[in-house]
């Protein structure tokens, strides 16, 4: 094992002594924790060596006690945990409930005690139902309130917000509901007054308004997502991967697999399942990402981030290959769009079909 047990001098043992004053009135017996974790910034100490060895496994990641059952790859940090786990394979239940009239059996003694204290140990059940002919007792007050629903048919936890008469069966559900009234205020920026009605709306707001923009180190264009930036950076490469359409009779090529998939779905398969729900629009798209990009058109706030310089009209050749020529060359270009297309198609290498869908080739842009 990577870590060894640290030496335990009398001073170290004294330092890890648990006293009655530290534990309060209900103090445990005084215990010397002689086995101390040697990992930096840990400070865990134990009174038995096997407990320390099991703890060290948390640092090293080791599980020295593997399950030997065929097909089971689980491992454990202590023999006790392995023994308890092995009972799930054998199905043995050697521990029987001690209460009269109860013959339930359990795989471990701890599970048997838990059952006994929950259902048979009346001494620790301090919350008793006083409805006629009931008398059931519970350890926790919220358990009693949940039980009383069977008598009153009224959920026990009522929303305290004025004008809201909703009720819930559990305090956790009431707490979650109260967020509807309080909301989720944005804490990313002191000047932001957004309050989300739900956690989902809050996360959506953070992603759209407070996400760090990814900046291209060549042209300084900004993008909301890093994958958009990666796609954009390919336009600056001299040698680029070209995706050729594998469909018979189609010589289209694209610089991203996304554009090729979009082309196949919308043009060849005529599938455009993503419809813009903005009133009066109704445009359809083959890819969800295309719809998300289009939605910026209808959102003035998003359009602010999409400001960019006007781009000159692209030739047919540049649209087919995805290549955008420099501005200086674009101005001085005297070759017609048809001639550019012919020269690029002639020099386009024949691709190899991959799984009948995508074809990749290298094309050097000069």
UniProtKB/Swiss-Prot annotation:
Species this protein is from: Xenopus laevis (African clawed frog)
Keyword Plastid: no
Gene Ontology CC: one annotated term: nucleus
Protein name per UniProt: Transcription factor IIIA
Subcellular locations according to the entry: Nucleus
Alphabetized InterPro entries for the sequence: TFIIIA_Zfn-C2H2, Zinc_finger_trans_reg, Znf_C2H2_sf, Znf_C2H2_type
Phylogenetic placement of the source organism: Eukaryota, Metazoa, Chordata, Craniata, Vertebrata
Phosphoserine: residues carrying this PTM: 38, 336
Top-level lineage group: Eukaryota
């Amino acid at each position: 094992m990577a870590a060894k047990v640290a030496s335990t001098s009398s001073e170290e043992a004294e330092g890890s002594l648990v006293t009655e004053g530290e534990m309060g009135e209900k103090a445990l017996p005084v215990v010397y924790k002689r086995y101390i974790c040697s990992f930096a910034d840990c400070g865990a100490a134990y009174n038995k060596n096997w407990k320390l060895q099991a703890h060290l496994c948390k640092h090293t990641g080791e599980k020295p006690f593997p399950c030997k059952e065929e097909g089971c790859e689980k491992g454990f940090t202590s023999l006790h945990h392995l023994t308890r786990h092995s009972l799930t394979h054998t199905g043995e239940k050697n521990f029987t409930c001690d209460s009269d009239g109860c013959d339930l059996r359990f795989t471990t003694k701890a599970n048997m005690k838990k059952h006994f204290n929950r259902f048979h140990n009346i001494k620790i059940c301090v919350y008793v139902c006083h409805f006629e002919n009931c008398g059931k007792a519970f350890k926790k007050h919220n358990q009693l309130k949940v039980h009383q629903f069977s008598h009153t048919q009224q959920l026990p936890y009522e929303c305290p917000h004025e004008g809201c008469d909703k009720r819930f069966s559990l305090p956790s559900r009431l707490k979650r509901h109260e967020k509807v009234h309080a909301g989720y205020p944005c804490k990313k920026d002191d000047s932001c007054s957004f309050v989300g009605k739900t956690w989902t709306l809050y996360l959506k707001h953070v992603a759209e308004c407070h996400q760090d923009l990814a900046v291209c180190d060549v042209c300084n264009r900004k993008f909301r997502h890093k994958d958009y930036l990666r796609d954009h950076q390919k336009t600056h490469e001299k040698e680029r991967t070209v995706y050729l359409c594998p469909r018979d009779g189609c010589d289209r090529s694209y610089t991203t697999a996304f554009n090729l998939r979009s082309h196949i779905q919308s043009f060849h398969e005529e599938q455009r399942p993503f419809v813009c729900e903005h009133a009066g629009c109704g445009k359809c798209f083959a890819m969800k990402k295309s719809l998300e990009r289009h939605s910026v058109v209808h959102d003035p706030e998003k359009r602010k981030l999409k400001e960019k310089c006007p781009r000159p009209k692209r030739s047919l050749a540049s649209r087919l290959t995805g290549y955008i020529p420099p501005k200086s060359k674009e101005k001085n270009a005297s070759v017609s769009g048809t001639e550019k297309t012919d020269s690029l198609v002639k020099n386009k290498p024949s691709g190899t079909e991959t799984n009948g869908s995508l074809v990749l080739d290298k094309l050097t842009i000069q």
